Amino acid sequence: MNTSSQFQQLEKLGEGTYATVYKGRNRTTGQLVALKEINLDSEEGTPSTAIREISLMKELKHENIVTLYDVIHTENKLNLVFEYMDKDLKKFMDTNGNKGALETKQVKWFMYQLLRGILFCHDNRVLHRDLKPQNLLINAKGQLKLADFGLARAFGIPVNTFSNEVVTLWYRAPDVLLGSRTYSTSIDIWSAGCIMAEMFTGRPLFPGSSNDDQLQHIFKLMGTPNESTWPNISSLPNYRSNFQVYAPQDLRVIIPQIDNVALDLLLSLLQLKPENRITARQSLEHPWFAEYHQ
């Protein structure tokens, strides 16, 4: 079961789109690691997603981003050796939360770390594009780190036209759902807002089952946008003039325990129009995080 003589595989942690992840141990140092094992198709060579992930991960060194220690390339396998993290945010919420809901203090500390990780990505011209509780890993010290850059991609200026297939539906920004292909850093900010609400309640904020259903969930809560609230929205490929018109709801109905300062940040993250969303840098300077400001 050895990935190589250097690491011992201990147990299987999960399977992703193109990889299996094991908990492992460095035979020499005894250090625990996560081994991401990618089977290489002899015809196709290394999947481009894997190559993208590797080249990005090796550059991104930050305390809120999972560290990639090593890449071991054998004939038919690619092994990525990551730092080992105890659990993901979803599991943390299920085991530490009250029916999944976390205390405000904990939500704040995790959000601060999440936004620091996002800022570091964005400062390095990288979009994560697939932020969700399962991609945020927590270690025993309570540190939160961004993982799984399978879909991430360095973005240049001018804005590239990206492929449409990104971000798990529940955390997907309305501009992406409406078919915009010129999205930018603001798509990660929307996902962060969805994750913040979910930490408060223990439930996904917008649990849509299809592209249209996802938009319906969003509009029902945040209000249906139109040309006056979001100029040029009607030019987006998936826009329909017959979207049901909803008025925005008060989020305190869903998150009664949220205070006004936290609500202000949440609403800044969850702006329908991407240009209106707060940036990662601005969000870290928000008064809700005052206690972390030196």
From Swiss-Prot:
Gene Ontology BP annotations: DNA damage response; G1/S transition of mitotic cell cycle; lipid homeostasis; negative regulation of calcium-mediated signaling; negative regulation of glycogen biosynthetic process; negative regulation of macroautophagy; negative regulation of phosphate metabolic process; negative regulation of transcription by RNA polymerase II
Record-linked Pfam families: Pkinase
Enzyme nomenclature, EC number: 2.7.11.22
The keyword Heme is annotated on this UniProt entry: no
Superkingdom classification of source: Eukaryota
Keywords per UniProt: ATP-binding, Kinase, Nucleotide-binding, Serine/threonine-protein kinase, Transferase
InterPro entries: CDK, Kinase-like_dom_sf, Prot_kinase_dom, Protein_kinase_ATP_BS, Ser/Thr_kinase_AS
Annotated Protein kinase domain residues: 7-289
UniProt KW Kinase keyword: yes
MF (Gene Ontology): ATP binding; cyclin-dependent protein serine/threonine kinase activity; protein serine kinase activity
Residue numbers binding ATP: 13-21, 36
Catalytic activity from the UniProt record: L-seryl-[protein] + ATP = O-phospho-L-seryl-[protein] + ADP + H(+); L-threonyl-[protein] + ATP = O-phospho-L-threonyl-[protein] + ADP + H(+)
One Gene Ontology term, aspect cellular component: cytoplasm
Catalytic residues identified in the record: 130 (proton acceptor)
Assembly, per entry: Interacts with a number of cyclins.
General function of this protein: When phosphate concentrations are high it phosphorylates the PHO4 transcription factor thus establishing repression.
PANTHER family membership: CELL DIVISION PROTEIN KINASE, CYCLIN-DEPENDENT KINASE 5
Family of this protein: Belongs to the protein kinase superfamily. CMGC Ser/Thr protein kinase family. CDC2/CDKX subfamily.
Name this polypeptide is given: Negative regulator of the PHO system
